[in-house]
Every structure is written in structure tokens, then in C-alpha cells.
Amino acid sequence: MLMVISPAKTLDYQTPPAVDQYSQPDLLDHSAELIDVLRQKSPLDIAKLMDISDALANLNVGRYADWQRPFTQNNAKQAVYAFMGDVYEGLDASTLGRPAIGYLQERLRILSGLYGVLRPLDLMQAYRLEMGTRLANGRGKNLYEFWGETVTAKLNEQLEALGQRTLVNLASDEYFKSVKRKALNAAIVTPVFQDRKNGQYKIISFYAKRARGLMARWAAERGVADPDQLRGFDSEGYAFDASASDELTWVFRRDRE
């Protein structure tokens, strides 16, 4: 079983990482190509391209200018400790022990617009580049065309190393579109998290994002290898609802009323 999650826009490069262990991203040559494209953009270009404020555009133009190899602990940080946001609050990696972090390093991958695929302990320099950004590049008109089969091939490589044929999709639609489903050598299980509101079960974005991180944490704490075990996920009141689920879409519901 291999899990995938999305990255986050918010980053933390101030808090020291919980562990010293790190790895290097596998696709940095591809990342460098994108950095070259981004460095040709003015702050105004970036603001329009990403629909962000002038202040954020200036911040990220500076990040692209500063981006350089080699990645070290002095100029980069492990991805799972650098990303913030709802998913990562649910995962709360800084409070996980070494065995659980080791589990995530093997069985969790972070999809990224700039880095393609990251392991949790891969060093990462700060950036903003969402997968849905329409950044024209030497391979096409957007990042989906840039990454092509590369992301899928990397996931297949890890699935083969694990000797397993199930990918658990905890990523957003925007990011999972970078995975070529037909080329993926695995069944895709997609957990769906719903909360009861006004008498109906609905996907509430904040809670659903947090729950994705909670599920990854739950699996890491238990060393889950068989995806069927994920049906036992019960963090923060969620429970598997067999009647609302099918073979590949697993619905977890919670009553908050």
C-alpha cells in the first residue's frame, strides 16, 4: 500500500525539524527546468499567473532566485516538516516517533508542482507552484503536460519496491490529475470524509483535508500494510460506512450535530 497527499501553500522554515535524517528529491533535474522558466517571470507576471498579491509574488520571485543545488540542511528542510496547512496539521509529523516516520518515508508520497513527487524526508527549498498553474514550459502549456508520465513512473517504481498493487489517494483532484490512472500499476482506493451538517452528510473542505492527514498518521502509528485495515480508521470520531462505500471509494462519516 502506497499513499499520496497534496502539498500545502503555507510553509514553515523557522521551526527546527523533529529529526536530522533526510533524503534528496529524485526529480531535481526536472525541478531545475521549471525554476529556469519561473526566473524569467517578473513579480507582476507571477502575481497574474498565480492570482496572488504583489507581496506574495515578490516573495516567490525571491525564492526562485535563491533556489540552488545542492540541497543541504542549511538551505532546505524535510518536506513533511516544511509544509503546513490542514492536511499537515492532521498528520502532525513532528509528534510522530522514528518508526512512524520511517513508515511514512516508505509508504507516503507528496505530489508537488515543482518537485513532482517527494518522500516525507526529502529536503525541499521553499516555493509556491500549484499543480494547476498554467505555466507554459518546454514540454507543454501547463504542469500536467510538463510532468507527463514522470510522476506516475515514480509511483510505479515505489509500488514495485513494496511489492504491492494498491494506491490510496489522499490527494486533492488538482494534484491527483498529475497521475496517469491507466499507466498506474495499481488499484486506486479513494477515501472520502463526510461530516453531518443540517441533517445531511457532506464533504466539508477543512475537515476533509485534516482527515486525510489523520488517516496517514493513523496508518503510520499502526504500521498498516494491507489497505483493508484502513477501514478501521476511527480518528476524531470518523467511522467507515460500508453502505455508502463501494470497492474503490471508501466513505468515512462523522456526526458532529
UniProtKB/Swiss-Prot annotation:
Transmembrane parts of this sequence: none
Record InterPro entries: YaaA
UniProt-listed GO biological process terms: response to hydroperoxide
Gene Ontology cellular-component annotations: cytosol
The organism's place on the tree of life at top rank: Bacteria
UniProt-listed PANTHER family: PEROXIDE STRESS RESISTANCE PROTEIN YAAA, PEROXIDE STRESS RESPONSE PROTEIN YAAA
HAMAP family: UPF0246
Protein name listed in UniProt: UPF0246 protein CV_1250
Organism: Chromobacterium violaceum (strain ATCC 12472 / DSM 30191 / JCM 1249 / CCUG 213 / NBRC 12614 / NCIMB 9131 / NCTC 9757 / MK)
